[in-house]
Amino acid sequence: ARNGAVVIVESEAPIQFTTSVIVKFLLNKKDEIGIGTSNEGEVEQAIVGGLYAKAYEAEFHHLNEFAEKLAEKYNLVGYTEEALDKTLPFGYQGKYYFVTLGFIDYMSVYNSYLTNPEISAKELRALFSKDDSTGEKMTIAMRFFIKGDKLPEQEVVDNIAADFLQEPNLPKASYPITIYKNFIVNRVGLPNGENIDAEISIK
């Protein structure tokens, strides 16, 4: 950020999420830092993503294990800690995925959390079902990386998509599944763009 810095903010409790704020420097005043700001809706999106993971903790735990098995099966890897440090924060994220959504679609969830930050997982599940009963407004973007230099055939990502459709007890969402070359562009904190992909929905 010009005349400022992008600061990564991590929350561990009562919900887990990662986001960023821009802190502007007051260049005309000594030893002062300006007000922190964020892109519109970014923090709210991160909070709702963290609430979704809290509401469906068992399903996300299963997703973590399932993604690990898929990576082993197809000789792929996820984000390393170093890569996660380089990437732009996406709210709730794991080694193989990040959760993305329009928080305005989940106002019952968001407002209930603001009213009661200790809201239970059971209550959250009921609210998510109220706002989005099929999970069609929720996206869990799966990202895998190859170990070598050459992308596999499209068939590999299609097979992963088929495996997802056969797997029970995963969080409801749309699942865009992408396999990238194993390279993160430091300048923008994103994969280098070369990829193969598929998309499925779990309702």
List each language-model region with its residue ranges:
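Extracytoplasmic/luminal low-complexity segments enriched in Pro/Gly and acidic/polar residues
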Residues: 141-203
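Long, charge-rich C-terminal accessory regions
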Residues: 57-156
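Exposed beta-strand-loop-beta-strand "reactive/processing" segments of non-cytosolic proteins
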Residues: 1-24
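A short, surface-exposed beta-strand/turn
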Residues: 17-43, 170-172
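Short, low-complexity, polar/charged sequence segments that are solvent-exposed and flexible
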Residues: 11, 26-29, 160-167
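Amphipathic N-proximal alpha-helical interface segments
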Residues: 18-30, 112, 118-136, 186-203
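Long, charge-patterned amphipathic interaction tracts in eukaryotic proteins
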Residues: 34, 38-68
